[in-house]
Amino acid sequence: MHNFLISILLLSSLFTSADEFSVMTLNAQNLFDIKDDPKKDDKAYLPIELKQSERHINSCKNIRVKSWKNECLYLDWDEDTKNAKLKNLANEIIKYDEVGPDILALQEVENLNILTQLFKLIQPYGYKDLTLIEGKDYRGIDTALITKFKILDSKLHYISFTGKNENKDTR
């Protein structure tokens, strides 16, 4: 993410006549839509009616952390809950300078669908472009940029970690 952000900042600075631009990084803390995506580990972030199958319940029972297991089983991630999260995020973003930062880097975004929903909420403040970078996080959550500049290209620069401190990829 660090190299990615630096690349975007350098490219953006070439195309702006302003002396300054602002950057905000924000962990969206599990920004999920309400659709079940079989390619993502989104089982905690679904409407309660999608959590009633035996398959879902058994999958949740394999979760070791009690609070995560309870979210998987009982959290009702419905349209109202998702919209409240989007509204709260948009309000936090716009608080910066009353119009939001020029470049917004987000972590923990599920997919382009939910990113686009956030983008539409803050677009009236001058935002012009967005990109989602599909990573290798085991849960399937990704990083994203929303910017007041046009994005020319985006690319994941994967860094492989090896050795005794090797961990699985996360957001």
Model region roles, listed by residue range:
Residues 7-10, 34-38, 115, 152, ...:
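A generic structural micro-environment signature
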Residues 109-171:
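Structured beta-strand-rich core segments of catalytic domains in phosphoester-bond hydrolases
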Residues 15-121, 132-138:
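N-terminal, active-site-proximal structural segment of metallo-dependent hydrolase catalytic domains
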Residues 4-16:
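Sec-dependent N-terminal signal peptides
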